[in-house]
Design a protein with these regions (language model features):
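Mid-domain alpha/beta scaffold segments of enzyme catalytic cores
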Residues: 1-318
Length: 318
């Protein structure tokens, strides 16, 4: 089973429609997968609930916040169940409080499994000017995450020192999930050593050949990794947008980096991985799948590990 720990299904459907695609959720999720869908405004969140209840779950009357895909069977062990989870947060690129009341209502009624995306984005001058507002909504969301004891899903670009500044508060949360982690193994280790129950979600940067992310996939603590597509975002060079099914290529390359290595590569990190020619820069997920050679046993070992991490990060239990 695959894990897509961060994606935007409503945006994906809209993107498909804008380029002449069907924009239907059935085909992208025809493979077994558990998902965490991220929303930033109430209309997007409500679309998620309708999309999955009607098209995937077949049960529009389900009262649960953890909607289980139609392939699941209730008596299966947790490791084999497929889940659709929802997160909601005020994004640092639009750090306004218009949706704060809606977010708090979701928290009070236990309709979401995490707060996020939240965090900081200092990627360009426009976003840097929003830093005071980003700090305000970040503080508010951390306070609520502690109050309701929910994980946070972190968006961070060029702002990791600000996240480190919040370590005393992050330590009080059940889990901290770094969406689209692009940092180094050393930075990731630092969060863990400081007592943060952190998970690091790896996306299509492993297909772009981003050295630090490939090093994470290759040799970082296996109990701390997740996988994602961020669909329809995080596209590769030859792709108009990302598909949810790209999680298959992300997973294959992560497993490839982790298992198709010599013992010397295992011990010496990203430089050795690159020298061993395991790191590749693919222009599309399709091209990646055509080239990656990894046996099914290795894929299963890797996905079983990611499923366990997903369940732990989001507090799922039988």
């Amino acid at each position: 089973m695959y894990i897509d720990a961060h994606l935007h299904p409503a945006d994906y459907c809209d993107t498909c429609a804008s380029v002449g695609g069907a924009g239907n959720v059935d085909e992208p999720f025809a493979y077994p997968a558990s998902l965490c869908c991220s929303a930033h405004d109430h209309t997007e969140y409500e679309r998620y609930r309708r999309l999955f209840e009607r098209n995937v779950c077949g049960d529009a009357n389900s009262p649960t916040t953890e909607i289980v895909l139609h392939q699941s069977v209730s008596h299966l062990p947790l490791s084999e169940k497929q889940h659709i989870l929802f997160s909601f947060g005020i994004h640092p690129q639009n750090p306004v409080t218009d949706e704060a009341e809606f977010l708090y209502r979701l928290l009070e009624t236990r309709q979401i499994h995490a707060i996020g995306e939240c965090g900081f984005d200092l990627f360009n001058d426009e976003y840097k000017q929003l830093l005071p507002m980003q700090q305000t909504v970040w503080d508010m969301q951390l306070r609520w995450a502690q109050e309701f004891q929910l994980p946070v899903v972190i968006h961070c670009r060029k702002a990791l020192p600000l996240i480190f500044d919040s370590v005393p508060r992050l330590k009080k949360l059940p889990a901290v999930i770094f969406h689209g982690w692009g940092g180094s193994p050393q930075e990731a280790t630092s969060f863990l050593k400081k007592g943060v129950n952190a998970y690091f979600s790896l996306g299509k940067a492993v297909l772009r050949g981003q050295k630090s992310v490939c090093a994470m996939a290759a040799s970082f603590d296996s109990t701390r990794l997740l996988t994602e597509t961020d669909a329809p975002y995080m596209r590769l060079k030859a792709e108009p947008y990302s598909h949810p099914r790209d999680i298959i290529a992300v997973t294959a390359q992560c497993a490839n980096l982790r298992y198709n290595r010599t013992d010397s590569v295992k011990q010496t990190g990203s430089d050795a991985v690159k020298r061993a020619c395991v790191i590749k820069q693919y222009e599309s997920s399709t091209a990646a799948l055509e080239e990656i050679s990894i046996d099914e046993a290795a894929i299963k070992e890797f996905t079983d590990m990611i499923v366990r991490n997903f369940n732990c990060a989001f507090g799922l239990s039988d």
